[in-house]
């Protein structure tokens, strides 16, 4: 894979933040695709990784856990040293630079204004077929208390929208999705992350 940051041959090593959320589902898909999944709970677990997935869950709770465990600063450092990051649902919230709601811990690694629970609470969870930039057919998105980006800054590439609301985006080495690809049988977003984001030398 071109652009491998740690220079090792063979399987890319991709961490999955295992503080909360669907980390096991992500790990199973990574394994099927030939990557080496690594559960990440402490800053030292980031060593030697090509990428990191921040799964869904409750973004404020995950953010507070990240602060108390030292993971917030560690993930920022990992990213700014060339590591790839993919945030799904709550991970999308955490990746943003600002939120429309109450203050909460954010990584600030993508220039975007996020609306938490933008599509409503759990009772309003839904599925939708998405037209995704670069995909040859629609992707079935599973939305659970999903956020969306109300606005994005320069350098952020919008990959998918619903009624003008940004639900997938990329900026260099960071990818975000408001939905849960790990809860479907469609592995295209995981393949995209491994190939295009982990394997890229591009910075945000």
UniProtKB/Swiss-Prot annotation:
Query: Does the keyword Hydrolase belong to this entry?
Result: yes
GO terms assigned for molecular function:
glutaminase activity; pyridoxal 5'-phosphate synthase (glutamine hydrolysing) activity
Identify the pathway.
Cofactor biosynthesis; pyridoxal 5'-phosphate biosynthesis
Matching Pfam families: SNO
Against CDD domains, the record matches this protein to: GATase1_PB
Does this UniProt record's set of keywords contain Lyase? yes
Q: What is its EC number?
A: 4.3.3.6, 3.5.1.2
Per the UniProt entry, what are the Gene Ontology biological process annotations, in alphabetical order? glutamine catabolic process; pyridoxal phosphate biosynthetic process; pyridoxine metabolic process
Sites where the protein binds L-glutamine: 57-59, 116, 144-145
InterPro entries linked: Class_I_gatase-like, PdxT/SNO, PdxT/SNO_CS
TM region positions: none
Top-level lineage group: Bacteria
Q: Which UniProt keywords apply?
A: Glutamine amidotransferase, Hydrolase, Lyase, Pyridoxal phosphate
Catalytic residues of the enzyme: 89, 180, 182
Q: Name one GO cellular component term.
A: glutaminase complex
The entry's family comment says: Belongs to the glutaminase PdxT/SNO family.
Quaternary structure (record): In the presence of PdxS, forms a dodecamer of heterodimers. Only shows activity in the heterodimer.
Q: What does this protein do?
A: Catalyzes the hydrolysis of glutamine to glutamate and ammonia as part of the biosynthesis of pyridoxal 5'-phosphate. The resulting ammonia molecule is channeled to the active site of PdxS.
Q: Which protein are we looking at?
A: Pyridoxal 5'-phosphate synthase subunit PdxT
Record the organism: Rubrobacter xylanophilus (strain DSM 9941 / JCM 11954 / NBRC 16129 / PRD-1)
